[in-house]
Amino acid sequence: MFRKAAVRGLFYPASPEEAEGFISENMSGAPLCEALAVMLPHAGWIYSGRTAVNTASRVNIPDKVILMGPNHTGLGARISVYPEGSWETPFGDAAIDSETASKLTASHLCTADTAAHINEHSLEVIVPILKYLNPNVRITPVTMMGLSTETCRALGELLASVCDDKTLVVVSSDMNHFENASATERKDGAALQAVLALDEKALAVTVSGMNISMCGAVPAAAAISYCKLRGCTKAELTEHTHSGFVSGDYDRVVGYAGVIFHK
């Protein structure tokens, strides 16, 4: 199965030259570290691409990456795994890691499904960055929606049973949406405090209690559960920003953050 890019030329440059130029200009230049997982934003690159590239370029991107993001369209299963084939990117097609996909869908938690992915942007905008940083990367795209904390933990356990030391989990999430900059910074700070504390329960309680529209809170919770099972004790915030710094509109912003979950 071949997934044609849905937002190429809209959320990120269509041409490989422009995409490469953007990525190369925003590389962190920091020494590469080994990570269990990273959290990257997924808005248009003009708004959140700097944060995504800055964070991803600090990490050694292995050949196997599991991408987990929110399902914005409502199509498909609650946990939808793209099973096989490849995804179009400006740098050539990114192959699906069908072996890992099969291991995930062998569980009752996950469903082999393409409907959830056809028009979903949350993972697509990240794939070109990964493909540029490691041309040999193979991806397992997973979207999710409406999961309880218990299901997130169960998914974390599944990931721990499937992933080896050469697998990176990438969480796709923006932070709070469409409030003023002050409110967004306050809400984002509270959610990020839970993320950095590696506390998936606190993240769920905080997001719900403070009405924080962090669209990737569910995959973030699953990743935190996974990382703790793999022995993670440190999460690092690489950058926290919002769309107002680009648009000039501080009355209605979206927050973005990059996080590295260290081995």
Language model region names:
Residues Y256-F261:
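Short beta-strand scaffold segments in enzyme catalytic cores
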Residues M1-K234, T238-S243, S247, H262:
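Active-site histidine-anchored catalytic micro-motif
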Residues Y250-V253:
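A short catalytic or substrate-binding loop motif that flags glycine-/basic-rich loops and adjacent residues
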